[in-house]
Amino acid sequence: MSILIDKNTKVICQGFTGSQGTFHSEQAIAYGTKMVGGVTPGKGGTTHLGLPVFNTVREAVAATGATASVIYVPAPFCKDSILEAIDAGIKLIITITEGIPTLDMLTVKVKLDEAGVRMIGPNCPGVITPGECKIGIQPGHIHKPGKVGIVSRSGTLTYEAVKQTTDYGFGQSTCVGIGGDPIPGSNFIDILEMFEKDPQTEAIVMIGEIGGSAEEEAAAYIKEHVTKPVVGYIAGVTAPKGKRMGHAGAIIAGGKGTADEKFAALEAAGVKTVRSLADIGEALKTVLK
């Protein structure tokens, strides 16, 4: 088992013929992902990377039976791309694009909830179930099928956790980058709930960062509902207050959202926290005895 995606997931790409869509679709195909086509308005009826191109998501879904879409569309047009995917009946949307206006995301979030559609992102690396399906921009070769579920607000820090779990021989069930924006399609709790139910996942690594209250909310959820061991790390311990650190959501505002507060919340919930990414492997060794 795994969560969200597996070897049978049929995937289309929106923004398929652009440079990002092309490069990452090539990588996904090489990894073994079941890419079945792509969407670029005006280029319908052509082929790209040996796959059919469609003008609309609805046409792509009708022709291919795709259930997942990955979006590499410039930020100003992303809202329409997501709404189009929802309207076409796509059940899993993975939005890689960074810089989508917050107001656009408010509209999108309402529509996602109304339609019961799961979205990962925006501003995220995507989702990978090692050895089966890779949707996003992750380096496939560092992953290894296994028993640790990883959920993170950061892309590159996810890869650090992956490398450690691979090097220590644990491997990963599924890795989910939920993204670094203030309004994500899915939050920590959504993914923790899935990992808790997934029989393949024996432990969870959760990587948070300063800003917002997502980690504190996740800690409260873990305390009540998660029986599997969780290893937690928070990025931004030395971040100055009021300065945005890379991600739009990574800012300590009004004295709230500091790394220390988040570490304290996780520790109070029984999470095994580490103060350095380099300690994740060792921490997992202690909780997976």
Swiss-Prot record:
Entry EC number(s): 6.2.1.5
Record-linked PROSITE patterns: SUCCINYL_COA_LIG_1, SUCCINYL_COA_LIG_2
Record-listed substrate binding positions: 159
Swiss-Prot/TrEMBL catalytic activity: succinate + ATP + CoA = succinyl-CoA + ADP + phosphate; GTP + succinate + CoA = succinyl-CoA + GDP + phosphate
Active-site annotation: 247 (tele-phosphohistidine intermediate)
Keywords: Ligase, Nucleotide-binding, Tricarboxylic acid cycle
GO cellular component, one term: succinate-CoA ligase complex (ADP-forming)
Superkingdom of origin organism: Bacteria
Miscellaneous comment text of the record: Succinyl-CoA synthetase (SCS) of E.coli catalyzes its reaction via three steps that involve phosphoryl enzyme and enzyme-bound succinyl phosphate as intermediates.
Xref: PANTHER family: SUCCINATE--COA LIGASE [ADP_GDP-FORMING] SUBUNIT ALPHA, MITOCHONDRIAL, SUCCINYL-COA LIGASE SUBUNIT ALPHA
Function: Succinyl-CoA synthetase functions in the citric acid cycle (TCA), coupling the hydrolysis of succinyl-CoA to the synthesis of either ATP or GTP and thus represents the only step of substrate-level phosphorylation in the TCA. The alpha subunit of the enzyme binds the substrates coenzyme A and phosphate, while succinate binding and nucleotide specificity is provided by the beta subunit. Can use either ATP or GTP, but prefers ATP.
Listed name of the protein: Succinate--CoA ligase [ADP-forming] subunit alpha
Gene: sucD
